Design a protein with these regions (language model features):
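N-terminal secretory signal peptides that target proteins for export/translocation
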Residues: 1-11
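Exported/periplasmic cell-wall-interacting domains
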Residues: 215-280
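Bacterial N-terminal signal peptides
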Residues: 16-27
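Alpha-helical, heptad-rich or low-complexity scaffold/stalk segments
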Residues: 36-95
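Primarily a LysM-type cell-wall glycan-binding module
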Residues: 41-66, 99-128
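Gly/Pro-biased beta-strand-loop elements
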Residues: 155-242
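Extracellular LysM carbohydrate-binding repeats and other cell-envelope/extracellular binding modules
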Residues: 74-107, 130-163, 279
């Protein structure tokens, strides 16, 4: 009996120890491990950050844009103060557009030799891109091309995600975030419709057809700005603005409103049938 009682006591102590570990020690260990992964896995000092940024600046001045982009992407993986991360992200996104609007070939572009009978609109249609993007990528100031010319053509699939909770539009190239833009979305009573749509038409200097009136592109009363990208949901789209102070707020009639310089950039990049996903 004494031996049995001793075994029982040992067993109970073992169970108590196991339960203590399960209830208290394991969560503490998991929390510590998670903290190490998120806050100290990739530490970097301000001195190291400044040195890296100076090196990137030298690369940019030397025209080594792709190497500079890679360095930015590496830096963003480090543990950084929120303000530094935001600055780096903006610099990377601006560089993304600079590379896109240059003749530098990337993994999502292809070289093309102009053939007899070619025209920019034919090439754009063939590769599901835009005339504007071909011109910007090859620094062309007119539509005329000649046989034998070498062109950089984008083969990326672009998509757009609009988050109405923070009034931000994200442009993706395949699955890589290319650039983030501030926007205005629907005000109270005129919400921006949540869902997935496609761009079905694109207009330069659009006419505004509002209830009971037609407002010409050159009228100060035309709030559509310089570009229109219409959705598969009739009456809705992405457009510019004559009210730049509203960007970043819920102020539109339900459409996605952008600064004119931003919508012109977006307009040049995305072709018809681009997917637009609106989330909250």
């Amino acid at each position: 009996m004494l031996f049995t009682r001793q075994i029982t006591q040992i067993f109970k102590k073992g169970i108590t120890t196991f339960l203590f570990i399960l209830i208290f020690a394991l969560p503490l260990f998991a929390e510590t491990a998670a903290s190490n992964l998120t806050s100290s896995r990739y530490p970097i000092s301000q001195t190291e950050l400044k040195t890296s940024l100076d090196e990137i600046d030298k690369l940019l001045k030397a025209g080594s844009l792709l190497e500079a982009k890679t360095r930015y992407q590496t830096l963003i993986q480090y543990d950084l103060p929120k303000a530094d991360r935001k600055t780096l992200r903006k610099a990377l996104e601006d560089l993304n557009i600079r590379v896109l609007f240059s003749p530098i070939e990337t993994s999502d572009s292809l070289p093309y030799t102009v053939q007899s009978g070619d025209a920019l609109f034919k090439i754009a249609k063939k590769y599901n891109t835009t005339v504007e993007l071909i011109k910007k990528s090859n620094h062309l100031d007119r539509d005329a091309i000649r046989s034998g010319m070498k062109l950089k053509i984008s083969k990326a699939v672009y998509s757009i995600v609009v988050d109405v909770s923070n009034n931000m539009l994200k442009l993706f190239s395949d699955k890589e975030l290319l650039k983030t833009y501030p926007v205005a979305t629907g005000r109270t009573g005129h919400p921006t419709p949540i869902g997935s749509y496609t761009v079905v038409n694109k207009l330069v200097n659009p006419t505004w057809y509002k209830a009971g009136a037609v407002v010409s592109p050159d009228s100060p009363a035309n709030i559509l700005g310089t570009r229109w990208l219409g959705f598969s949901l009739s009456g809705y789209g992405i457009h510019g603005t004559t009210l730049p102070e509203t960007i970043g707020s819920a102020a539109s009639e339900g459409c996605i409103r952008m600064l004119n310089e931003d919508v012109e950039e977006l307009f040049a990049i995305v072709p018809i049938n681009t997917t637009v996903k609106i989330v909250d």
